[in-house]
């Protein structure tokens, strides 16, 4: 028997029985172990928090299947598949559900030394990686990361593996800032960006950052990021707001020659080196195994999938304060 989490309407999440497709000679049956809530994407869909006419408006239709980051174990192997076996632990981009039938090309293998709670960040790490590709990061750059939710935490950790000179992180929540420091941030500043621009410049020795990552999905951030970034600097928008009409440009854009680039999960498609996202997952696992990238202790809340409504209401009410929120599928027997 298979179960999946479904948004049946605005702010309504349930666990319901689901019908699986038949196993074919070229597919795998997976049993989920853990799946991570994307508190940005999924809360936008859960609360129907977006403008009419946006891509959100055309995508989010109820019933809606949330989720895209699952750690699972192989339960059955199609007869034509030779390089996977029952018991192998894998990751898959799939909605929150107890079981999945997938092709071999949809999975990446998890090294034994990496726990489920570390591995489950693979998809969020991939999205952050797309942001770094869009940034065309320069050696020695001073970088500011605005927002240290799950996505911002991944950006900080990727930056820490590069030759950036300084990584300053701005967020209202001290606990999230502490996690960012563990992930490699060189400076952390608590508060709202509009009140902390001078503090950022001071921390950077009187310099403005050459590069800013906006990981907030808060439309008010862009105008203040434009004030903060250096002349001819770059702003990468990773947080996908549901209210783009509320994002405002300032005269800094033209007068100071600033570049703004959007980065999205799908932007690695067609990339000559990273078009197969499994290569990014494998790199992520290599860095986890070597200790150069850590996702340990980033999960702060764990839920039985039968508590889906409770999980999303908590994520909504404590937005900006939680770390990773995880569904533990071992609770379903």
Region spans (language model):
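N-terminal glycine-rich beta->alpha transition that marks the start or flank
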Residues: 18-70
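Residue-level marker of beta-strand positions
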Residues: 34, 69, 88-89, 99, ...
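A glycine-/small-residue-rich N-terminal strand-loop-strand element
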Residues: 69-93
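A structural motif shared across PLP-dependent enzymes of the aminotransferase-like
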Residues: 93-104
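Mid-domain Rossmann-like dinucleotide-binding core that forms the NAD(H)/NADP(H) cofactor-binding site
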Residues: 115-193
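Glycine-rich cofactor phosphate-binding loops and adjacent beta1-alpha1 units
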Residues: 178, 183-261
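C-terminal substrate-binding/catalytic core of Rossmann-like NAD(P)-dependent dehydrogenases/reductases
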Residues: 198, 202, 206, 247-299, ...
């Amino acid at each position: 028997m298979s179960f999946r989490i479904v948004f049946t309407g605005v702010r309504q999440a349930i666990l319901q029985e689901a019908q699986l497709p038949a196993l074919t000679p070229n597919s795998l049956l997976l049993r989920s172990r853990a799946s991570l809530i994307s508190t940005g994407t999924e809360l936008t869909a859960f609360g129907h928090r977006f403008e009419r006419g946006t891509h959100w408006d055309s995508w989010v239709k109820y019933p809606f299947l949330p989720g895209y980051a699952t750690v699972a174990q192989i339960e059955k192997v199609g007869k034509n598949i030779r390089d996977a076996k029952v018991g192998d632990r894998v990751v898959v981009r799939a909605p929150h559900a107890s079981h999945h039938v997938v092709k071999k090309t949809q999975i990446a293998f998890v090294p034994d030394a990496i726990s489920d709670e570390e591995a489950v960040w693979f998809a969020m790490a991939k999205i952050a990686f797309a942001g770094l590709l869009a940034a065309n990061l320069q050696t020695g750059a001073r970088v500011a990361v605005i927002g240290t939710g799950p996505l911002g935490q991944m950006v900080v950790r990727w930056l820490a593996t590069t030759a950036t000179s300084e990584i300053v992180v701005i967020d209202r929540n001290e606990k999230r800032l502490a996690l960012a420091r563990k992930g490699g941030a060189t400076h952390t500043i608590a508060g709202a960006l509009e009140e902390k621009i001078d503090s950022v410049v001071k921390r950077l020795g009187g310099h403005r950052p050459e590069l800013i990552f906006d990981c907030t999905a808060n439309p008010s951030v862009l105008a203040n990021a434009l004030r903060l970034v250096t002349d001819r600097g770059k702003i990468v928008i990773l947080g996908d707001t549901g209210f783009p009409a509320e994002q405002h440009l300032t005269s800094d854009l033209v007068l100071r020659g600033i570049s703004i680039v959007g980065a999205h999960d799908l932007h690695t498609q067609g990339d000559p080196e990273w078009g197969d996202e499994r290569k990014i997952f494998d790199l992520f696992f290599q860095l986890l195994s070597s200790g150069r990238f850590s996702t340990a202790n980033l999960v702060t809340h764990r839920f039985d999938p039968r508590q889906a409504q409770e999980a999303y209401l908590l994520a909504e009410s404590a937005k900006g304060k939680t770390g990773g929120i995880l569904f533990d599928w071992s609770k379903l027997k």
